[in-house]
Every structure is written in structure tokens, then in C-alpha cells.
Regions:
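Short alpha-helical segments that sit at the start of domains
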Residues: 1-15
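Short acidic, hydrophobic short linear motifs in intrinsically disordered regions
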Residues: 22-34
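Short, hydrophobic-biased segments on the C-terminal half of alpha helices
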Residues: 46-47
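Glycine-centered, phosphate/nucleic-acid-interacting loop/turn motifs that mediate DNA/RNA or nucleotide
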Residues: 53
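Short, Lys/Arg-rich nucleic-acid/phosphate-binding segment
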Residues: 59-66
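Short, amphipathic alpha-helical interaction segments positioned at domain boundaries
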Residues: 72-83
Length: 83
């Protein structure tokens, strides 16, 4: 049975929350690997989350985009006010 998009989104937010705790952003390839997704699917979800304001894309010196969780995204994940 295919997973719901909601489950996938929360799995991605969880991956980004762990990276946030360590103080760094993740490239799409690492997000895809950690969330057990193919890279095209991960890119589609990251674009959707970026447009929703849940993640922030940052360019690196190697021109790869890395993503980090915004406060809004963290609040969606924990269901309240994140500090």
C-alpha cells in the first residue's frame, strides 16, 4: 500500500529536525536517503515544503542547494510553538 503524502512530509520534517539539532542543513541526496525516497520525489517534496515556508533553501559554495527547517516547519512538526 502506498504511503500517504502526509506521512512522507512528516518523515522529511523529522529528518530536517534532526539536522537542525546538529546545526546544519542537508542536501537533497541526504534527505532522500534518510527519508527512504528517490531523489526526484525528494526534490518534489522539498519544493512543495519550500513554497509552504516549512523549509529554507541555501546555496553552498559547490552550488548545491541545502535545506534546513524553518521555525514554521518545526512548529508544524511538534504541533505548537517552537522556540
Amino acid at each position: 500500500m502506498p504511503e500517504s503524502e502526509t506521512l512522507v512530509v512528516f518523515r522529511i520534517l523529522g529528518v530536517l529536525a534532526k539536522a537542525r539539532d546538529l546545526g546544519h542543513a542537508l542536501p537533497v541526496a541526504e534527505i532522500a536517503d534518510a527519508a527512504h525516497l528517490g531523489r526526484p520525489s525528494a526534490e518534489r517534496y522539498m519544493n512543495m515544503l519550500k513554497h509552504a515556508g516549512a523549509v529554507r533553501a541555501e546555496a553552498t559554495p559547490t552550488q548545491l542547494l541545502e535545506y534546513s527547517l524553518t521555525r514554521y516547519g518545526l512548529e508544524r512538526l511538534v504541533g505548537g510553538c517552537a522556540r
